[in-house]
C-alpha cells in the first residue's frame, strides 16, 4: 500500500493485493469487498477533512498570528448523523488526521488501539464541554430566565474551564445584545473562554454580526498582521449546516471587516461528509465514485503462465472505468507527482507501494502522528 497520509490523485492505485498461497487463488477477490466497505468512507472523510484544513491554512496564514494552530479551527460534530457507531468512529479518526477536535470521543480510543497512540500524552483528539438545548430549556423552566444559568455556568459549574453554550434556544440576539453584556463582569473574570453557539438561521450573516457585536461589547486586540482578535474570554463556535462554501464565506467576510479567522471555530456535521455543495449550489452525494475508490483484478497466473487482466468498456464515455492491467509500479516523477506504470508480470519491489501485511505479519507500522505529519507536509501549522 501507499503510506497512509499520502495525497494520491484519482487513477493511481493505493493498494495492491496479491495471494501468497496456491490453495486460495480467489482470496484477493473475496477480500476486495471487505476492504472497500471498511476503507472507502474513511478515505473520503480524510480527503474532505483535508479540504477543510487547506481552507483553514489559507485564512490563518492571511489573518492570524503565525503561532496559532489551524488544526483547532474545525471540529467533527457528525457522530449522530452517521449510519452507525462503527462508521462514526472510523470516519472521525480520518478527520483527526487534519484537525485535533472531535465530539466523537470513541474515535480517540480507536486511534489509541490501532495506531499505538496514547491520548494521555499525545494530542490525538480533543473534545469540549458544551451545553445542549435540553440544558438551556430545563434551567429556563426552573429559573424563568436565561441569565441565571449563564452566570451559574461561569461562576459555579465551569469557573476554570472553557465551554460552549448553545445560545438560540429562545432568542439569540437577546442573548448577544442584552444577556452577555449584563454578564460582562463574570465573563471577564472567568478562567476560560465562553464560546457562544448559534444553531439556526443564516450562518454567514449571524456569525459575522455576532463577532462584530462581541467586539463592541468585550473588545480585544489587533494581531501582528493587523486583524482584530476578540478578548480571549469570549468567542463563537458555529456548528449548524457548515459546508466548505459557507465556512469560506464567513472567513472571507471577517477578513474584509478586519477580523482574524481564529475568532470563530466550526463544528462540521454529518451532512458535510455525506454530500458536498459545489459553488453553483449543486449537491454531490459522497459515494465511492466521488474520489474514484475502486478495486479491480489486474493480474493472474493460469497453468503457470502470467496473464494480464483489465476492463475497458466501450460504453464508458467518461473513461473512468478502464482499469490498469498487470502488476503496477507507483513512483514519483521528476516533479514529485505520483505516477503509475502497469503491465508488469510480477509484484514491483522498488516503487512507492510497500508491504503492509504478508503471511500473518504486519510491516511498516507507523504512529498516528507520523501519518498526520505526512498529510500536512511535515508542519501542521503551515
Question: Where do the PLM segments sit?
Answer:
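Buried, small/hydrophobic-residue-enriched core segments of structured protein domains
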Residues: 4-224, 243-246
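Structural preference for beta-strand elements that scaffold enzyme active sites
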Residues: 162-164, 193-197, 233-237, 263-267
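Gly/Ser/Thr/Ala-enriched C-terminal appendages of enzymes
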Residues: 100-118, 139-148, 172-173, 180-186, ...
Amino acid at each position: 500500500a501507499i503510506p497512509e497520509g499520502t495525497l494520491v490523485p484519482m487513477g493511481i492505485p493505493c493498494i495492491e493485493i496479491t495471494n501468497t498461497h496456491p490453495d486460495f487463488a480467489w482470496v484477493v477477490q473475496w477480500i476486495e469487498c471487505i476492504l472497500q466497505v471498511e476503507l472507502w468512507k474513511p478515505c473520503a472523510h480524510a480527503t474532505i477533512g483535508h479540504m477543510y484544513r487547506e481552507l483553514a491554512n489559507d485564512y490563518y496564514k492571511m489573518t492570524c498570528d503565525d503561532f496559532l494552530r489551524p488544526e483547532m479551527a474545525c471540529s467533527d460534530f457528525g457522530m449522530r448523523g452517521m449510519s452507525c457507531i462503527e462508521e462514526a468512529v472510523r470516519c472521525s479518526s480520518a478527520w483527526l488526521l487534519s484537525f485535533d477536535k472531535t465530539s466523537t470521543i470513541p474515535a480517540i480510543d480507536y486511534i489509541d488501539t490501532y495506531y499505538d497512540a496514547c491520548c494521555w500524552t499525545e494530542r490525538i483528539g480533543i473534545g469540549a464541554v458544551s451545553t445542549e438545548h435540553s440544558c438551556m430549556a430545563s434551567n429556563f423552566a426552573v429559573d424563568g430566565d436565561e441569565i441565571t444559568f449563564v452566570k451559574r455556568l461561569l461562576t459555579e459549574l465551569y469557573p476554570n474551564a472553557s465551554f460552549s453554550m448553545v445560545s438560540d434556544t429562545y432568542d439569540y440576539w437577546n442573548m448577544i445584545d442584552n444577556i452577555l453584556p449584563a454578564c460582562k463582569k463574570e465573563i471577564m473574570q472567568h478562567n476560560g473562554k465562553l464560546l457562544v453557539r448559534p444553531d439556526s438561521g443564516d450562518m454567514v450573516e449571524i456569525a459575522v454580526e455576532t463577532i462584530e457585536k462581541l467586539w463592541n461589547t468585550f473588545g480585544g486586540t489587533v494581531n501582528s498582521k493587523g486583524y482584530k482578535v476578540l478578548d480571549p474570554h469570549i468567542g463563537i463556535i458555529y456548528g449548524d449546516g457548515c459546508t466548505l462554501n459557507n465556512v469560506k464565506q464567513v472567513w472571507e467576510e471577517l477578513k474584509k471587516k478586519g477580523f482574524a479567522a481564529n475568532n470563530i471555530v466550526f463544528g462540521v456535521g454529518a451532512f458535510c461528509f455525506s454530500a458536498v455543495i459545489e459553488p453553483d449550489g449543486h449537491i454531490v452525494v459522497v459515494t465511492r465514485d466521488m474520489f474514484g475508490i475502486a478495486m479491480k483484478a489486474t493480474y493472474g497466473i493460469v497453468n503457470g503462465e502470467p496473464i494480464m487482466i483489465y476492463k475497458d468498456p466501450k460504453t464508458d464515455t467518461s473513461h473512468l472505468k478502464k482499469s490498469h492491467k498487470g502488476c503496477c509500479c507507483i513512483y514519483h516523477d521528476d516533479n514529485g507527482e505520483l505516477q503509475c506504470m502497469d503491465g508488469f508480470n510480477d509484484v514491483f519491489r522498488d516503487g512507492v507501494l510497500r508491504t503492509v501485511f504478508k503471511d500473518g505479519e504486519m510491516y511498516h507500522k507507523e504512529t498516528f502522528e507520523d501519518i498526520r505529519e505526512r498529510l500536512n507536509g511535515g508542519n501542521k501549522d503551515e
